[in-house]
Amino acid sequence: ASYWGFTITDGALRMLVLLHFHKLGYSPVQIAFLFLLYEFCGILTNLFGGWIGSRVGLKATLFAGLSIQAVSLVMLSFLNPEWAVALSVGYVMASQALSGIAKDLTKMSSKSAVKLLVPAEDDASKSERLLFKLVATLTGSKNALKGVGFFLGAVLLSWLGFSPALWSMAGGLLVILLVCLIYLKGDIGKSKAVSYTHLRAHETSI
């Protein structure tokens, strides 16, 4: 559910940025630059996300993804239309970099958690079919919900305006984060490796 909520806000954010800066008169190339670090930081997060998740747990990376996205939305809401174009582009690129990190942390956490939470069955093929169905549902719903997000972003921009729309989405993410904090227990996906200092203490006692 947290991944679905995040996906909607992520799609809405893309549409908000695209429409708002087109309205301000930015060129297609300038608008394209706004999303450059979003994609680049997403690639970097994909490279190291699994390693981070195994060290701190998937719950921590999920919470980090939701929190970073909320920070990105609030940061973007403080953009001043009076700033120079170069400063505005750099500022938005920085906020989109955070959003790219948040997107892949949340995606990695959600998909990995599904694999870990599938109950073990005596029939291995039954577990595999259930896992395939859940992952396919999660992945397939992404495009549909992103489309909902595009529409939501356009509606919020025309109804509330740029900054209030961003604040409302940040508030929605904080509600999702609060629900996850209450109901998600345990260290999902955290490596169970025993630390070196613990091993040394055990050897000494022997």
Locations of regions flagged by a protein language model:
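Helix-loop boundary and gating motifs at the non-cytosolic
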Residues: 1-40
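Residue-level signature of mid-helix packing/kink "hotspots" within the transmembrane helices
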Residues: 39-43, 47, 146-147
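Helix-to-loop junctions at the C-terminal end of transmembrane segments
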Residues: 45-57
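C-terminal ends and interior cores of transmembrane alpha-helices
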Residues: 67-85
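Cytoplasmic helix-loop-helix junction between adjacent transmembrane helices
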Residues: 95-140
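Symmetry-related core transmembrane helices of the 12-TM Major Facilitator Superfamily/SLC fold
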Residues: 165-181
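Conserved small/polar residues in nucleotide/adenosyl-binding loops
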Residues: 197-204
